Amino acid sequence: MLEYHLARVHQAKLVNSHILATSDTEIDKPIVKFCQLKKQPFFCGSESDVLSRFYHAALQTKATPDDIIVRLTGDCPLISATLIDEAITKHRQGDNSQYTHISLNYFPRGFDVEVFSMASLTKAYQNATKAAEREHVTLYLYTQPDCIIVPVETGQLDWHEFRLCVDESEDLQLATALIGLLGENWLNASPRKICQLLQQHPEIAQINAKIIQRAPH
């Protein structure tokens, strides 16, 4: 699943540095070995303080305060490079202090993209004190009263019912079936193509339909 994720992320045209942030625990050693094998840059940090892990991973890329940071999660094998570029473009058109994200009212979970500045990430790292804010990287950012939240809403309302992230066994079954259906087109399949396939094959969409997403993301 991670290999599918990385391959699709690498299609993004506006990303010039991509680092995988994993934990320093024994259970994630296979991820480290995978990254070493694939020559994929990575950073190992705290298992519970994910905000710290993400912040130090960004530091490893020598990010400056004005640099744009994109947050993705590795449990999204069909993440869209098109949406990554679209979110970055939307962010560039506004204020760099804003929080830009793919709206899950118009897209399935599994296409999640969050965009913010390194300065905003540093502010969160230095000021977030609640356990939930340390566990969920961007929670502090988008819950601040002065946060400007800019959603990307170019999908369709009926797409949000689908679920493309892989947290449960049913999610893996759906992703496997969908990638099999996409065949050789899996690498460049657009969000529209993927969602249309799910609409055309409700038996696949139903595989994980009963799973309730844990919040916050």
Residue ranges and their predicted role:
Residues 1-27:
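N-terminal glycine-rich phosphate-binding loop and ensuing alpha1 helix
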